[in-house]
Amino acid sequence: MATLSSPTIITTTSILLNNPFLPKTPQLSAHHHRGVRSVNGKVSCQTKNNNGNDENNQFQLIQNPNTNTPYLLDRRNILLGLGGMYAALGSEGANYYNTLAAPILPDVEKCTLSDALWDGSVGDHCCPPPFDLNITKDFEFKNYHNHVKKVRRPAHKAYEDQEWLNDYKRAIAIMKSLPMSDPRSHMQQARVHCAYCDGSYPVLGHNDTRLEVHASWLFPSFHRWYLYFYERILGKLINKPDFALPYWNWDHRDGMRIPEIFKEMDSPLFDPNRNTNHLDKMMNLSFVSDEEGSDVNEDDQYEENILLMRKAMVYPSVSDDPNKAELFLGSPYRAGDKMEGDVSGAGILERMPHNSVHVWTRSNTIKGNQDMGAFWSAGRDPLFYCHHSNVDRMWSLWTDVLHGGNFPKTPEYDDYRNAYFYFYDENANPVRVYVRDSFDTERLGYKYEDQELPWMSITQQQQQQQRQQQRQPLLGGRLKTRTFSLVKKVLTELKVMLPLPLKYSVIKTKVDRPKKSRTKEDKLEHEEVLVINFKLGKSKDFIKFDVYINDGTDYKPEDKTKINLEYAGSFTSLTHGGGGGGGDMSHMAEEDMGKNTVLKLALNQLLEDLDATDDDSIQVTIVPKSGTDSIVITGIDIE
């Protein structure tokens, strides 16, 4: 690893299982809550095995004999005898993790109230109706088989099938009319997202750690399952089991607007808590606020949108690096990790354009970033599910179309595969679903209608032309035209000392590369990754900063994000609610309020585009855009 010299470098990727997993006394205590049982020493759930037989699934506490650290294990994940298990405790790598599998498990018996808004003016809680774990069944494909494969189609083509559109409106209307006691009702479905995304559930065995499915490798799978059951509920309500959700096709020019079917004010698909300035406007997939870039014409905006999509989808897919799945899907998140400090960060799929679309859609007049701009309220807008249908489509495209190589499509750790969530199905029955069963949309019974992918066909010549049009570096106080080689030479001479606050100033610094002039084989096997470590404090605003490589532009925070050839990516984060019970954050340590976070960006293809593969170093530019007052950059490395 090449490291930028810094007095303080904070490493944030804590994937080793060396955190205190449980109190030193190996005893769990679940207090009597909402009529469910109390347990000590083990957590027992009655489930069904693959043959439909009852199975007493017990989580047991054991200790690593090398470290005396206790771990919570699911017996079904241990395929070794007792002697083999203890021998494996001293091993390293994936076998170590898989033997001591520590997946994230929600403690749904302890759902807590939360303040929805930061100032507490609107109180709400995120707890769906409680259920008895003793009667909860595990998901089995045979019990949710579809006789006809569902086809999700672009929302902007909805008027071509009036029968389907009428069914969609009727299903949403019925869902909204269901009583709050029904877990399938519109508000209760929205609360599912709030509960898993705003810290209402503690992690099983870790009462001081709140579960959060964003900013980790859980993000894609959770939302796929969420839409899966939401879609089945809608079909059940109108007695059409083959009903399929639409997808908001924001990666295609025809879909880069809020779909018309969601703008009819008398429709159940309408939500008043949207940005009224954007109802008929082409989307900006790198959006921050209406104040920046309002004068950009549609053709230029479209070109930037598809270049952003290419950088988000194609650039991370050009090598066979075994860690590629985590780079795209999100960083590891294991039991014992605290989202306030141990979880590294969101994957490419979540950061852009997912987060920007949320912010583009949220209300511009109502406080609290409602509805789409905050985790606690996003599920209240029917457009949310259409948006996430396209996010899910991006995952499918990355897996089935862009994959093409030998790297794993998903992380291979049992910590990831054996994590689970609870949902209500179309019959209002609770069901437990595992991450490992979410990978194949064909088995889940749905697919996406094919649509042109304009971001797949951008040519090198088009990118070079865009670079020439956009390059106007400000050097020596005067605007001059420079050749790319001269600009690169000047830029890479500067190096800054960290840590540095990002509050209002742009950070430009030289970063040494660990290896230059890499062979084709080396680049195929290993992705060069830019790693930006930073402290992230609380913010009431959408958080965003942009990153550029070898760019001579004199950027200012108020400038519109320029999606040019040098653009490497952005860090983004939506607004959270209070969590933790009435906004009580006492379960968090003081030092955790500024959490260690990391942004990882793929460099292989970008360095090729910039003719920088033979350089000893690169220049990194970090531009604050929104909510960065509490961000401190602590380290910039290449690995």
From Swiss-Prot:
Reported cofactor(s): Cu(2+)
Disulfide bonds: 111-127, 126-194
GO MF term set: catechol oxidase activity; metal ion binding
SUPFAM superfamilies named among the record's database cross-references: Di-copper centre-containing domain (SSF48056)
Start and end residues of each stretch annotated as Disordered: 35-58
Chain sites annotated for binding Cu cation B: 354, 358, 388
Catalytic activities: 2 catechol + O2 = 2 1,2-benzoquinone + 2 H2O
One GO cellular component term: chloroplast thylakoid lumen
Residue numbers binding Cu cation A: 193, 214, 223
Enzyme Commission number(s) of this protein: 1.10.3.1
Transit peptide, residues from-to: 1-101
Family annotation (Pfam families): PPO1_DWL (PF12142), PPO1_KFDV (PF12143), Tyrosinase (PF00264)
Keywords carried by this UniProt record: Chloroplast, Copper, Disulfide bond, Metal-binding, Oxidoreductase, Plastid, Thioether bond, Thylakoid, Transit peptide
Subcellular location: Plastid, Chloroplast thylakoid lumen
Cross-link (2'-(S-cysteinyl)-histidine (Cys-His)): 197-214
Comment on bound cofactor: Binds 2 copper ions per subunit.
Record InterPro entries: Di-copper_centre_dom_sf, Polyphenol_oxidase, Polyphenol_oxidase_C, Polyphenol_oxidase_cen, Tyrosinase/Hemocyanin, Tyrosinase_Cu-bd
BP GO annotations: pigment biosynthetic process
PANTHER family: SHKT DOMAIN-CONTAINING PROTEIN, TYROSINASE FAMILY MEMBER
Role: Catalyzes the oxidation of mono- and o-diphenols to o-diquinones.
Family from the record: Belongs to the tyrosinase family.
Record-given protein name: Polyphenol oxidase, chloroplastic
